[in-house]
From Swiss-Prot:
Its main location: nucleus. Phosphorylated by STK3/MST2 and STK4/MST1. Phosphorylation is not required for SAV1 stability and may increase the number of protein binding sites on the scaffold molecule. One of its GO terms (biological process) is regulation of stem cell population maintenance. The modification Phosphoserine is found at residues 95, 138. This is Protein salvador homolog 1. It comes from Rattus norvegicus (Rat). The keyword Nucleotidyltransferase does not apply. Signal peptide: none annotated. GO terms for molecular function: identical protein binding; molecular adaptor activity; protein serine/threonine kinase activator activity; transcription regulator activator activity. The gene is Sav1.
Amino acid sequence: MLSRKKTKNEVSKPAEVQGKYVKKETSPLLRNLMPSFIRHGPTIPRRTDLCLPESSASAFSASGDGVVSRNQSFLRTPVQRTPHEVMRRESNRLSAPSSYLVRSLADVPREYGSSQSFLTEVNFAVENGDSGSRYFYSDNFFDGQRRRPLGDRAQEDYRYYEYNHDLFQRMPQNQGRHTSGIGRVTATSLGNLTNHGSEDLPLPPGWSVDWTMRGRKYYIDHNTNTTHWSHPLEREGLPPGWERVESSEFGTYYVDHTNKRAQYRHPCAPSVPRYDQPPPITYQPQQTERNQSLLVPANPYHTAEIPDWLQVYARAPVKYDHILKWELFQLADLDTYQGMLKLLFMKELEQIVKLYEAYRQALVTELENRKQRQQWYAQHHGKKFLS
């Protein structure tokens, strides 16, 4: 008897397992991991409009209390609902896109469970003084579980659904009812889920926040007309030599230890003069006391013996400079000879000045002598004429 080969559709279908599925405990570490579609959003078209096969649908309906998918199929007749229920489901569907709703509690990291922004978006409620937290989930929450891609991930999807279903079973029965205005999970942007630390940082002057059509948060720099995905003060650290100081008197400011100054503006933020605040602290550099008098160091070449050839070179005309091969000297020797030439030049200037000074003194002496002679001549010749 010939064996019939399996077609592609039959190979892709998950194998049916007879019996009851056993719940697999999800590791707490894996629950804290955020899936990639929450961090970055859907980057490729997801096949979310496909309907579940009958085999998987029966497995879901056994533990899902008869939840029916929102997508209509020609193989099954649509479920008859009351007009009030249809209007409520349509309002929830339009208020939050299903592609950005939180799929399950395991998809959200636990550290956001205690943050204020996530609490408001999951809609905790406290009624009649009861401090116990009440969870309310919309129909989109269950529809998102039914619309996940099929294939080799069918058992994983069932594990997520069973985990959420067990959470509902552990809740009291009186806490599962819907209240007005709380039975809807709002569409949380990706920027709110990933940038909780940047919300605490203030935006520099000229910056604003906006969201894309898909709900991703970005920052606009109106000073340079540019956009950025990350916070302007979060993506860059402090430059070397800077320190952030949190003072109860002056607030948070930044200190530049290199230039000894302080400012409120982040050193990496763009400077807008009309928005810049005055510095919190004015540094006054301490003047060092001069205990010792400043002494000019003596010229070491005053006592050095100057070579004869260097004295000849200093007095020789410029046309003989090519005779010396300066490239044969070492650099240290050239520095030494340069200092000696400066010393000879200073001595020559000193000698010239002394010669001019001696000449000036001789002129002054000659003038004084001539004046005395004229006075003496005038006195003696005057007495001779009078006698």
